[in-house]
């Protein structure tokens, strides 16, 4: 896949960006370079390759050292909700904005 200068102009327009011609050319080069890299990665035969959770796991046996899931701060819900204009059953009440 490769983009053209008109594709870059359209994307910039959709993003509400104004790109100078040199910026547009640079973006075209960078994005097409990215797409080339993706195509090269897609072409690699990965049949039989086991997915890795961590890249170092391919060369050595690692055990992830995860910390215990413990609350590090006290529950200050009531104190935090004192300044709220409306609270119900421990939840902040906000105006409906989507019909």
Swiss-Prot record:
Q: SUPFAM superfamilies recorded for this chain?
A: Glu-tRNAGln amidotransferase C subunit
**Is the keyword Ligase in the record?**
yes
Question: InterPro entries, alphabetically?
Answer: Asp/Glu-ADT_sf_sub_c (IPR036113), GatC (IPR003837)
Q: What is its EC number?
A: 6.3.5.-
Record-level GO BP terms = glutaminyl-tRNAGln biosynthesis via transamidation; regulation of translational fidelity; translation
- Can you name one GO molecular function term for this protein? ATP binding
Q: Which chemical reaction does it catalyze?
A: L-glutamyl-tRNA(Gln) + L-glutamine + ATP + H2O = L-glutaminyl-tRNA(Gln) + L-glutamate + ADP + phosphate + H(+); L-aspartyl-tRNA(Asn) + L-glutamine + ATP + H2O = L-asparaginyl-tRNA(Asn) + L-glutamate + ADP + phosphate + 2 H(+)
> Which EC main class describes this enzyme?
ligase
Q: Which domain of life is it from?
A: Bacteria
Which family does the record assign? Belongs to the GatC family.
Summarizing the function annotation, the protein's role is: Allows the formation of correctly charged Asn-tRNA(Asn) or Gln-tRNA(Gln) through the transamidation of misacylated Asp-tRNA(Asn) or Glu-tRNA(Gln) in organisms which lack either or both of asparaginyl-tRNA or glutaminyl-tRNA synthetases. The reaction takes place in the presence of glutamine and ATP through an activated phospho-Asp-tRNA(Asn) or phospho-Glu-tRNA(Gln).
Which PANTHER family does the annotation name?
GLUTAMYL-TRNA(GLN) AMIDOTRANSFERASE SUBUNIT C, MITOCHONDRIAL
Entry protein name: Aspartyl/glutamyl-tRNA(Asn/Gln) amidotransferase subunit C
Q: Which gene encodes it?
A: gatC
């Amino acid at each position: 896949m490769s983009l053209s200068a008109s594709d870059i102009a359209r994307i910039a327009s959709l993003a509400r960006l104004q790109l100078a011609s040199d910026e547009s050319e640079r973006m075209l080069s960078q994005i097409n370079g990215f797409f080339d890299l993706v195509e090269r990665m897609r072409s690699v035969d990965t049949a039989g390759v086991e997915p890795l959770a961590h890249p170092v796991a391919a060369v050595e046996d690692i055990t992830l050292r995860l910390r215990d899931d413990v609350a590090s701060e006290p529950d200050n819900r009531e104190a935090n909700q004192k300044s709220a204009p409306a609270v119900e059953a421990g939840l902040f009440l906000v105006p409906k904005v989507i019909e």
